[in-house]
Design a protein with these regions (language model features):
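Active-site nucleotide-sugar/metal-binding loop of Leloir-type enzymes
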Residues: 2-15
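Short beta-strand-to-loop acidic/aromatic patch adjacent to the donor-nucleotide binding site
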Residues: 12-24
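Conserved beta-strand edge residues that scaffold enzyme active sites
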Residues: 22, 47, 145-146
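Conserved catalytic core of nucleotide-sugar-dependent glycosyltransferases
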Residues: 5, 26-112
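C-terminal catalytic/acceptor-binding lobe
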Residues: 97-98, 102-183
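Amphipathic coiled-coil/heptad-repeat helices and related helical stalk/stem segments
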Residues: 1, 25-26, 124
Length: 183
């Protein structure tokens, strides 16, 4: 990833769009993310396993020196409009090149296998922690919904099913907007 950023800078590109090989993206992903007019704009995708867990994270309340890259999963999100997060993953993220002028190198580092992940982290958590330290906001457009492929496609329907079944809510109340309709 660091080499891609350097090449983009050398070619005076304005943005980089990050995705992963197992993503199914909506056809209007780039225009919708550009509409946010934010340094980092992301769509939403859901983690493998069919549980409907969005790949969205906030920083942990207490950072530890041994691993400052820890994040807490966001289990529910506001579907009514754009919102801020600390880490939306790298599966659907559009970034202005100016971000890489404010965040020091290396932008990406992968230590996910260190000590069985006890002190490990993924390149997304590493990068977005440095983004937060640089004071850059990360925004998500909830109208950009992506699916992720494993042995099955997991996506928004899994998220809605999890909410309706009450898994992962800690007994919380769910308010559904009348305009939200499952496809």
């Amino acid at each position: 990833c660091n080499a891609i950023v350097k090449e983009a800078k050398e070619n005076n590109l304005t943005h980089i769009f990050w995705t992963e090989s197992d993503m199914i993206l909506p056809k209007d992903v780039i225009p919708k993310l550009l509409q946010l007019k934010k340094p980092i704009a992301a769509g939403i995708y859901f983690l493998r396993g069919g549980t409907g867990q969005p790949c969205l994270y906030k920083k942990t309340p207490l950072e530890i020196k041994e691993n400052p890259y820890l994040h807490t999963p966001i289990t529910m999100y506001d579907e009514r409009g754009p919102f801020k997060v600390d880490c939306p993953g790298m599966g659907c993220a559009l970034m202005e090149m100016g971000v890489f002028d404010k965040v020091p190198e290396p932008w990406f580092d992968l230590k996910s296998n260190d000590l069985g992940k006890t002190n490990g982290y993924g390149q997304d958590l590493y990068f977005y922690t440095k983004v937060r330290w640089a004071g850059i906001e990360v925004w998500v457009n909830p109208s950009v919904i992506c699916d992720q492929i494993e042995t099955q496609i997991v996506g928004y329907k899994d998220y809605r099913r999890r909410l309706m079944e009450g898994r992962g809510l800690g007994g919380g109340f769910i308010g559904l907007d009348a305009h939200v309709v499952d496809k």
